[in-house]
């Protein structure tokens, strides 16, 4: 299948990953509410796509407990090394770091919930990524996208673009939220059509 034309994206962050663990981020992004909406509960399988520092990975791993699994997917080998070190330090045995491809998360098993947290604007071939992700979703799985309004090049992307691309990849919009008071951040929830 020919690769779709690449859309404009932001340059992926390559600096110190610990900046993503800023104080107050849990409250600002309402991450417990996000996990509630995505149905992340004990025993579930979750994918953190574009895991970066593992900020969400760690929170999801604690939520799903020992009977659940979190796949921490990133295309940056340094991020995977960072996450691997972090989960050892935090003694989390339910996290599986995965070095994915730009258009395929390479998930080894079906997942119940997925979150792309401030990642979607960096995906050059989002429709292909979502199609590959779709094949790894359990029945009733939810896919969440948290991002900022923008044009793709400024570490943000218009929510209408995300909705259109997800629709083209075989997803339907289930819910949408504006959690952050700045009017820029949004949270979209999709399911398979």
Predicted regions: what they are:
Residues 44, 105-114:
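A short acidic, Gly/Pro-enriched loop at the edge of an enzyme's catalytic core
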Residues 42-43, 66-68, 137-143:
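Short glycine-dipeptide loop
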Residues 163, 173-193:
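Core SAM-dependent methyltransferase catalytic element
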Residues 61-62, 127-142:
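A short glycine-rich, Lys/Arg-flanked "PGG" loop and its adjoining helix->strand segment in the class I
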Residues 47-105:
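Class I SAM-dependent methyltransferase SAM/SAH-binding core
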Residues 140-152:
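Conserved beta-strand signature within the Rossmann-like core of class I S-adenosyl-L-methionine
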Residues 112-126:
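A short SAM/SAH-binding and catalytic strip from SAM-dependent methyltransferases
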Residues 1-47, 55, 82-85, 116:
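Class I SAM-dependent transferase core
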């Amino acid at each position: 299948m020919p690769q779709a034309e690449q859309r404009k994206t932001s340059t992926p962050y390559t600096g110190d990953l610990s900046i993503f663990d800023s104080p107050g981020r849990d409250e600002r992004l309402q991450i417990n509410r996000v996990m509630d909406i995505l149905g992340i509960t004990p025993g579930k399988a979750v994918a953190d796509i574009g895991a970066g520092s593992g900020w969400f990975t760690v929170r999801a791993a604690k939520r799903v407990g020992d009977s659940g699994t979190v796949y921490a997917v990133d295309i940056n080998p340094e991020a995977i090394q960072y996450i691997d070190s972090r989960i050892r330090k935090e003694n989390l045995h339910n996290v599986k770091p995965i070095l994915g491809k730009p258009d395929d998360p390479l998930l080894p098993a079906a997942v119940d919930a997925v979150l792309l947290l401030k990642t979607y604007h960096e995906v050059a071939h989002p429709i292909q990524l979502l199609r590959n992700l779709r094949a790894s979703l359990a029945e009733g799985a939810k896919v969440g996208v948290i991002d900022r309004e923008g044009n793709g090049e400024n570490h943000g992307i218009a929510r209408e673009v995300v909705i259109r691309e997800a629709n083209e990849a075989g997803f339907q919009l289930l819910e949408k939220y504006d959690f952050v008071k700045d009017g820029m951040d949004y949270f979209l929830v999709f399911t398979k059509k």
